[in-house]
UniProtKB/Swiss-Prot annotation:
Residues 1-189 are annotated as: Enoyl-CoA hydratase/isomerase. The lineage of its organism: Bacteria, Pseudomonadati, Pseudomonadota, Gammaproteobacteria, Vibrionales. This is Fatty acid oxidation complex subunit alpha. Residues 311-723 are annotated as: 3-hydroxyacyl-CoA dehydrogenase. PROSITE patterns: 3HCDH. The record marks 119, 139 as: Important for catalytic activity. Heterotetramer of two alpha chains (FadB) and two beta chains (FadA). Keywords: Fatty acid metabolism, Isomerase, Lipid degradation, Lipid metabolism, Lyase, Multifunctional enzyme, NAD, Oxidoreductase. It holds the Pfam family ECH_1. PANTHER family: TRIFUNCTIONAL ENZYME SUBUNIT ALPHA, TRIFUNCTIONAL ENZYME SUBUNIT ALPHA, MITOCHONDRIAL. The gene is fadB.
Amino acid sequence: MIYQAKTLQVKQLANGIAELSFCAPASVNKLDLHTLESLDKALDALAADSSVKGLLLSSDKEAFIVGADITEFLGLFAKPEAELDEWLQFANRIFNKLEDLPFPTLSALKGHTLGGGCECVLATDFRIGDATTSIGLPETKLGIMPGFGGTVRLPRLIGADSAMEIITQGKACRAEEALKVGLLDAIVDSDKLIDSAITTLTQAIEEKLDWQKRRQQKTSALTLSKLEAMMSFTMAKGMVAQVAGKHYPAPMTSVVTIEEAARLPRDAALDIERKHFIKLAKSTEAQALVGIFLNDQYIKGLAKQSAKAASQDTQHAAVLGAGIMGGGIAYQSALKGVPVLMKDIAPHSLELGMTEAAKLLNKQLERGKIDGFKMAGILASITPSLHYAGIDQADVIVEAVVENPKVKAAVLSEVEGLVDAETILTSNTSTIPINLLAKSLKRPQNFCGMHFFNPVHRMPLVEIIRGEHTSEDTINRVVAYAAKMGKSPIVVNDCPGFFVNRVLFPYFAGFSLLMRDGANFTEIDKVMERQFGWPMGPAYLLDVVGIDTAHHAQAVMAEGFPTRMAKSGREAIDALYEAKKFGQKNGSGFYQYTVDKKGKPKKAFSDDVLAILAPVCGAPQNFDPQTLIERTMIPMINEVVLCLEEGIIASAQEADMALVYGLGFPPFRGGVFRYLDTIGIANYVAMAEKYADLGALYQVPQLLKNMAQQGTSFYSAQQASAL
């Protein structure tokens, strides 16, 4: 053994070849600080051993290295710039040391080789993989960019255009694509990976392969003429500006970094990369996007705990009520390997449900995600039925009938009598209290809410609603089933609107008040989309939700929270509802809708709507963008904080993920609690108090006032644990 540490070891093989194997005690290898320090010492030991003629990098895991340890990021990013620079220089010295070893080096890859793992193997002379190999640099998805030499070595290895595509998109290349662009030198069978690696390395040692020429290419300036460089970088900037936009600076910064470093040798180019990395690491966007990643891991961890604690796994499911929503739920269950009975009283609804499932599977087939055989198998695992025969086989039943409490209660009561005492019943409802529906059941402990979002196949969030009688085992089993479906389940306690709809309607109320005071709805939409970053402004979102649906839900919320959410009079939603302008579903709401050539709705503004809205709108008035943002967002933010204060949702992490996954809250802002931390809670309290005269929705929750006085934040613990 040449060197041994907790996460890696170096041993001598035959013919002067040494093998450096990453072998962390955890389930995956990560390039955390400890592993980097061990790698540094291992490389020193290798350089000092005159018997070593070649080095093979390998992994004892199914994945080579999944990347840096992201849990360390927020702590590192919070350090002074000089300390952050030292960390990057330390990592750069290690990879330079690997690249400068006086003998050829080769990485044998399998599974994921991502982020810092990819940057590590870019420092070796050769890379071969098997069919499972996936290699790439996903850092821009976290609001940062490669910082261990990725923007320097990748363009010099595969060319600037291919490198910029991979880096700006945060892309991982599968084996075939990696081979095509030059990231991999060969793909071999998994059982021959190490033998092939040794053969290739031996050829390099014997100088049958020119490893020194390859190394020189990676450590020299890019070979681009001035004209080629101008065309390449101008085109890349144009494409990135179009796709990433101003709220996500990391992709554009990556292009600028590669451009600035193009004519420089390795070490000077690394200085450029380091400078830009630090700038991004200190950005609020990076804090938010890294925070989302960590929060997502937290949600997944909770789901795993639930699966472990659950009394049984879900092997079979049933959906009551077909149509688009029922078909979407059935599709998602079957796609992830849980056969499902789809029951409805109407043949045309069953047909619609099966058509929806088939349509979604066809899209998977077209994209090459599944083959025809698998598609047939998935469709066969959805059993459409007009009867309850076979319902007793279901471990979990999802009721998804019409949003009517009497109908839902009757269906749930009926099906409860047909299944055994262990079967879990759930209701897919967006507005009906779970405690109300539970009254119709003999076993309310086996019942909870399971609120899917439309379209089911795209929206990651499922709200799991705990009623006052719901058992912990019921929650665990349903959370585990939702996770098995590939969803992000978040548990909330029962209240009107649960969590997502409860916090959405104060946002709509803020929007309605602005219109009452003379704001133009198109201007509000423009500001909330382009400046705040929502995928849709409030008027457009109401059209998509459905004005009729929103009108009904608004009444439910007003009844549930009369102090804050009762209407003071007719509003824009009422005016459109009375005019039967229901939004996208019937072609007219705030906007007019037509269908484009691809069958997708296309919106346009029409003056006709102004006459309908005139009685509920004040005299036209201009508001500056910041006022529009503050007046729409403060009611939502206050309601989110109240939900945490009241225990409707358990943590800031879960609330922020529900907002991002359920409502499309701008990811670069990280959710309401991350947003509050970013702008400063004391600053928010002062800002919100300016609008106190607008009513109860604008009153700052006591929790925020206390935190402002104490100078605390919601994510201080997450940052401290990373230090």
